[in-house]
Amino acid sequence: MAFSAPTFSLANLLNGSYGVDTPEEVERVRSEQREEAAAACRNYRPLPAVDVSESVTEDAHSLRTPDGAPSEEVSVEFVTYGAEDYLEKSDDELSVAFETMVKPMRIGQLWCPAFNKCSFISSIAMARALLLAPRTSHRTMKGFEDLVAAIYTKSDFYYDEECEADDIQIDVSSRDVPGYSFEPWSRTSGFEPPPICEACDMIMYQCPCFDFNALKKSCAERTFADDYVIEGLDGVVDNATLLSNLGPFLVPVKCQYEKCPTPTVAIPPSLNRATDRVDINLVQSICDSTLPTHSNYDDSFHQVFVESADYSIDLDHVRLRQSDLIAKIPDSGHMIPVLSTGSGHKRVGTTKEVLTAIKKRNADVPELGDSVNLSRLSKAVAERFFISYINGNSLASSNFVNVVSNFHDYMEKWKSSGLSYDDLPDLHAENLQFYDHMIKSDVKPVVSDTLNIDRPVPATITYHKKGITSQFSPLFTALFERFQRCLRERIILPVGKISSLEMAGFDVKNKHCLEIDLSKFDKSQGEFHLMIQEHILNGLGCPAPITKWWCDFHRFSYIRDRRAGVGMPISFQRRTGDAFTYFGNTIVTMAEFAWCYDTDQFEKLLFSGDDSLGFSVLPPVGDPSKFTTLFNMEAKVMEPAVPYICSKFLLSDEFGNTFSVPDPLREVQRLGTKKIPYSDNDEFLFAHFMSFVDRLKFLDRMTQSCIDQLSLFFELKYRKSGAEAALMLGAFKKYTANFQSYKELYYSDRRQCELINSFSCVELRIERSSSTKQRKKKDGIERRRSDKRRTPTGSYGGGEKTETKVSHEESTGTRSQKSQREGAFKSQIVPLPTILSGGWSGTDRAPPCEHGGIIRI
């Protein structure tokens, strides 16, 4: 029976069986070592006391130095104890000994190599064995660089007895394992020779080709991470590297693992580095070059133009009610962005705006499909769905769970909105065919260069009230969780508690991608899609009466926007805000994809709503025309295809793990959003900052390899410079560092007004003369009929003294009219200053502090 070659470990090396530990096996070997060390500690029996120090240090100077090693004396002061003695030491003592003997390199709070008790004690035992090997064996041991290479190549530690050591000069590089390099190394004084210019052969500091002062200034902000790509240390620093760092008693040999090939051409340093400090002007220049039509986009009055201009639209069966429109509630203002990224203002749901959105999102349903037998074909599509995606054994063994708990969670979530158990309606008494309608006030960022000719239309939401949704949502949530548990391993739905876009052990590089873009997805769905959903829901275990009930009030419905006074009937198409929207869109996309492509040819398949992405080793084969001719969808196969789904790029790190990165083009547009409400304590701005930080938590995983992937995918998808994407990452890194940096992106006119007034330490005092108007006295406080504010009474110069808090939002004309109605001032009137862009307005355009008194604003 053939046994596999033993892997390299210190234990196997001591007992004579040794092998190679590849980077992919490091984690497995280390776990085995930890288990062996734990077992050794449990079964440890102290050995008889032996004076090890005399046996080691007696002839320490007579030990032979391996060939090719430096001639410095080898110190053995740290190996006077055996491995058994180190087992009795505490972790703190071992940590101090590790730092003294190995001298690890510190990277922040990390050590390279990292401290491991088992590996450290085993290394000491091996070092002691290597020191005694020349005395215990008559054979000639190889030089240490050859010795380390022999460990990796599974060759002998000693030279052949028939040949002398001098006769065998083995080229170590010819026996290297790919990715490893072994070369003699000796400690130096730390002096580094000055760089030499390739152009004129002079020292770079004296070379006229380089401006040393500018170079010094550009490199002032450099850190360790700017020049060295810090990868995960686990798996890179192995036992052989740890042994080579035990310098006091081993011949120094540089043994390192190189993940990336060393560049053959040395590139002279550039004066403009990517690590230069990021400022607001750099970010704006990136926006101007990447989004040329966005930088000058200003839609402040676009909706005013729409409301005041002539309007013509062609819709059938529309009901308009103009008598009970809900007036717009004025807000407290919004923060103003410093960047101009093409972000629009909030949309108000007026009648014209709603009609425009309905025309684009709900009306003009395309008729692209052929005539088919709906009953027979819907069953066939549903059957193909289960064969392609569902694990039958898991579906048979799983059941509904957490339906009631999901209901209570939903009620608790919306408790603050006034939803209670007593207000739940009787669904049999409700007309479920009536849906409320609204438009989204936030418009999705536009990545195409069309803002100069096309005004984005807001998306619409068609929804039931919370009392109705609360009774359907728990059922579909539990059904979706069961659906996820029954999916095959290669199918990923990036939503919920048990799935995400993080894929461990899967590399997106060297794969063929397939991305299908489905346009007009919601309104293109018809009776065929509804029948497919009904068969799939019944197959997943949803009660048949509920499935039929749900599908019945989706066949013909009526939507109404109470605020805009617009209503119209619709049929079949997706309701964008009910309890089944995401789940229904996902299974429709999966069913259509399984009918057009053989899913067995893909290694991974990702679905989320109307988005889909597939990875295959060979170019995918299928018939995408069926999306149009059979399923009535406007489908487009994205070419060139890149790993992109849910507005995120998928990248792979050096360890073969895949993670998601939000689209930099969309994120840089969000930095200029105009939808952050103003607040005195910046609570809304801080909430946007925390959301921004959560979306960009991937930045800590971005190595140079990942940045190169992102630049390539960005360039392929948008036909724009990939270097701009790398610069955007630098901006994201700055503005996620702290909230103070993020606040540089926004300002407020109100905040500027308060900032100016904060330098004034005066208070405006207004004295009113006695008036003939009737007053009321209550609790000793005079109150004018026309003035609802209560003001304390007092005497000042024979008159009544009041302190009036004046809002800066009042206009000067309004204030003067009120003053005339209230009466003439007995004392000198101090004009209330008005803050303009050019300075102060009022008497002599002087700040209020020059008039004296007290002003409160």
From Swiss-Prot:
It holds the Pfam family RdRP_2. Keywords: Nucleotide-binding, Nucleotidyltransferase, RNA-directed RNA polymerase, Transferase, Viral RNA replication. Its EC number is 2.7.7.48. It catalyses: RNA(n) + a ribonucleoside 5'-triphosphate = RNA(n+1) + diphosphate. Residues 511-624 form the RdRp catalytic domain. It is an enzyme of class 2 (transferase). GO terms for biological process: DNA-templated transcription; positive stranded viral RNA replication. PROSITE patterns: RDRP_SSRNA_POS (PS50507). Residues 772-857 are annotated as: Disordered. Residues 800-812 have a biased composition (Basic and acidic residues). GO terms for molecular function: nucleotide binding; RNA binding; RNA-directed RNA polymerase activity. Interacts with replication protein 1a. Belongs to the ssRNA positive-strand viruses RNA-directed RNA polymerase family. RNA-dependent RNA polymerase which replicates the viral genome composed of 3 RNA segments, RNA1, RNA2 and RNA3. This is RNA-directed RNA polymerase 2a. The lineage of its organism: Viruses, Riboviria, Orthornavirae, Kitrinoviricota, Alsuviricetes.
